[in-house]
């Protein structure tokens, strides 16, 4: 995609952008995990579907966190129709002038990102409980993404990425907590549910229709 302050056309185009830069990485991880753990083969199709959300959750978090940094260099990866719906003209918007329109826009975007994050957790919980290494790898990324989303949710009209950057202490606590509960799906669900209290979540159906022509095709038996 060419960098421009005009943004992306709509949410479908944002889905496709996120797929190209992150969703394919999620699919690659799903393939690698299935090759490494033969017991995952019966779940492979579901893993591949959820893996796209794994990538998009992380990418959307970065897009929202870096929205003003990207703007400084003339780039915008936000969906144009959603901006218009909330009355936001991002091309001429100064960070300090976001107001209620930009706040409501960001909250909608956070709900979408949270929906993908929920799918990403489901992806992670499908991994064998005894494979704590690959579980931790996924959980650390999801935990930090959730903390960032929560910081943006508390301050959607932030004017610089440093205002929503998570602390090193938070990173350490996230790594410790997710590692400690890595083998327990019940504990992990409770941990993420508690950490996400207050956040609205949009249900994301998989596979995404917007990228159905791009995803890895099912292998024929």
Label each region the model flagged.
Residues 1-57, 69-221:
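Catalytic cores of Mg2+-dependent Asp-rich isoprenoid enzymes
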């Amino acid at each position: 995609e060419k960098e421009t302050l005009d943004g992306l056309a709509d949410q479908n185009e944002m889905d496709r952008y996120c797929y190209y830069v992150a969703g394919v990485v999620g699919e690659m991880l799903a393939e690698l995990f299935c090759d490494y753990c033969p017991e995952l083969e019966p779940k492979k199709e579901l893993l591949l579907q959820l893996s796209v959300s794994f990538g998009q959750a992380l990418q959307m978090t970065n897009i929202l966190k870096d929205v003003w940094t990207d703007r400084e260099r003339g780039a915008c990866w936000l969906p144009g129709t959603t901006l218009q719906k909330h009355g936001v003209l991002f091309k001429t918007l100064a960070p300090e002038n976001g107001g209620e329109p930009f706040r409501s826009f960001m909250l909608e975007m956070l709900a979408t990102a949270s929906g993908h994050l929920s799918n990403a957790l489901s992806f992670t919980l499908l991994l064998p409980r005894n494979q704590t290494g690959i579980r931790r790898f996924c959980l650390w990324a999801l935990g930090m993404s959730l903390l960032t989303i929560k910081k943006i949710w508390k301050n959607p009209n932030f004017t610089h990425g440093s205002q929503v950057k998570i602390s090193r202490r938070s990173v350490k606590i996230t790594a410790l907590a997710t590692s400690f509960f890595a083998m327990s799906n019940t504990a992990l669900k409770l941990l993420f549910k508690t950490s996400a209290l207050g956040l609205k979540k949009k249900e994301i159906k998989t596979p995404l229709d917007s990228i159905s022509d791009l995803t890895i095709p099912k292998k024929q038996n």
